[in-house]
Curated annotation (Swiss-Prot):
Pathway it works in: Amino-acid biosynthesis; L-tryptophan biosynthesis; L-tryptophan from chorismate: step 5/5
Enzyme class, spelled out: lyase
Active site: 48, 59
Species annotation: Ruthia magnifica subsp. Calyptogena magnifica
Protein name: Tryptophan synthase alpha chain
Gene behind this protein: trpA
Its job: The alpha subunit is responsible for the aldol cleavage of indoleglycerol phosphate to indole and glyceraldehyde 3-phosphate.
Family per similarity comment: Belongs to the TrpA family.
InterPro entries: Aldolase_TIM, RibuloseP-bd_barrel, Trp_synthase_alpha_AS, Trp_synthase_suA
GO cellular component: cytosol
EC number: 4.2.1.20
A Pfam family the protein falls into: Trp_syntA
Protein keywords: Amino-acid biosynthesis, Aromatic amino acid biosynthesis, Lyase, Tryptophan biosynthesis
A GO MF term: tryptophan synthase activity
UniProt keyword annotation of Iron present: no
């Protein structure tokens, strides 16, 4: 059983998986490593690491700027894999999902990337700009090394697309609870509930809900219907706000992570 499967299946009834997102290398790779430790201490079950990219079209302003800062510091895919390998020296229970764009993976080569990700003990990969219909080659390479290929589902996703995702997705489904980019507003929990029922009829995987979760109240509301709660923009905002004060950065990220985790467990 994969690390992701273990996390989702062994959680006590009524408790939900907490998945925080941070961009690798934003404020420095050493800081990212410390942030990962803090997130684990404050309830993270899975950590999504953003792989820096020069044109993060699916991300809102907060996360897009974090990509810009990390790219400006020269952080790339190889650095992220090295970071995960370092993390694994002291943690073999928290799952790590790489979330990024297709170009760096294509440049690396699908099989070479899959092998390197496996060597670093990455658990899942989410490529935000790869259409599922074009994912077979990457899927095959990741399957060879038992790494899950995770896909996004939106309010606008058709039944036809959901049926196809049921044949190719693994790990969990990342449900975008809003129309727009990361960091958007106006979370409609009733709409999320209704759509998740539709997704569950077609895809037999855990569902994590992201976008629009701003506090413990919204996290708790979503967790009634989701298997996991995903939070990113607010954590990344703390990294930017306290870029020159590491202790405050770690403290604020830790406090917020604990608040969300406590609300859903």
């Amino acid at each position: 059983m994969s690390r992701l499967s273990t996390i989702f299946t062994q959680l006590p009834v009524g408790k939900k998986v907490f998945i925080p997102f941070i961009t690798a290398g934003d404020s420095g790779l050493d800081n990212t490593f410390e942030l990962m430790q803090v997130l684990v201490k404050n309830g993270a079950d899975v950590i999504e690491l953003g792989v820096p990219f020069s044109d993060p079209i699916a991300d809102g302003p907060i996360i897009a700027k974090s990509h810009e800062r990390a790219v400006a510091d020269g952080v790339g895919l190889c650095d992220v894999l090295s970071l995960v390998k370092k993390f694994r020296q002291s943690n073999d229970t928290t799952a790590i999902v790489l979330m990024g764009y297709l170009n760096p993976i294509e440049a690396f080569g699908y099989q070479a990337f899959a092998n390197a990700a496996s060597e670093s003990a990455v658990d899942g990969v989410l490529v935000v700009d790869m259409p599922p219909e074009e994912a077979h080659d990457l899927k095959r390479s990741l399957d060879d090394v038992n790494i899950d290929l995770i896909f996004l589902v939106a309010l606008t996703t058709t039944d036809e697309r959901l049926a196809f995702l049921a044949t190719i997705a693994s790990g969990f489904i990342y449900f975008i609870s809003l129309k727009g980019v990361t960091g958007a507003e106006h979370l409609d929990v009733d709409l999320v509930k209704m759509y998740l029922l539709r997704v569950r009829k077609m895809i037999n995987l855990p569902i994590g809900v992201g976008f629009g979760i701003k506090n413990a109240k919204s996290a708790k509301a979503v967790s009634k219907y989701a298997d996991a709660v995903i939070v990113g923009s607010l954590l990344v905002a703390f990294v930017e706000q306290y870029a020159n004060d590491r202790n405050k950065m770690l403290a604020n990220v830790g406090y917020f992570a604990d608040e969300i985790s406590t609300a859903i467990k």
